[in-house]
Design a protein with these regions (language model features):
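N-terminal beta1-alpha1 cap of cysteine-dependent amidohydrolase-like domains
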Residues: 1-98
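Cysteine-nucleophile active-site neighborhood
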Residues: 76-130
Length: 130
């Protein structure tokens, strides 16, 4: 179930910004929550109400709902876990990206959007090829 992890305080804002934090409960090895907090902070300073949703295992990525998608880094184990779920989101993610959706992918998130990556243990993990 998609859940909201961060939300701007209630007040008048000029804009609304909806951010998907892909697998934010699993992919946060290098402090990627800090990246999301900075996106929220800067957007609020520029007059945007911000809502950040964690889109994780078994959740639908609604390509029409999000203004920005963020996909952070993770350890090999977490990447191998979500690599099994990621194909269920491929069509919507590909459509989102190929039609001008904003995606900030870092480290493992970037790898998982490519063709494949090789774990430290030499195992090949197939990715989305977007």
């Amino acid at each position: 179930m998609v859940y909201t992890s961060l939300k701007s305080p209630d007040k008048d804002y000029q804009y609304d910004l909806h951010i998907a934090h892909l697998y934010g409960d699993l992919m946060n090895t290098y402090g990627d929550n800090g990246n999301v907090l900075m996106l929220k902070y800067v957007a609020e300073k520029l007059g945007s109400r911000v809502q950040v949703d964690i889109v994780s295992l078994t959740d639908l990525f609604d390509k029409d709902l999000y203004d920005i998608a963020f996909f952070g880094g993770g350890q090999d184990y977490e990447q191998s876990v979500l690599a099994k779920d990621l194909p269920t989101k491929k069509e919507n993610l590909a459509d989102y990206i190929e039609n001008g959706g904003v995606m900030l992918a870092i480290c493992g998130g970037f790898q998982l959007l490519g063709k494949y990556y090789i774990e430290a243990g030499v195992r090949k993990i197939n990715s989305l090829s977007i």
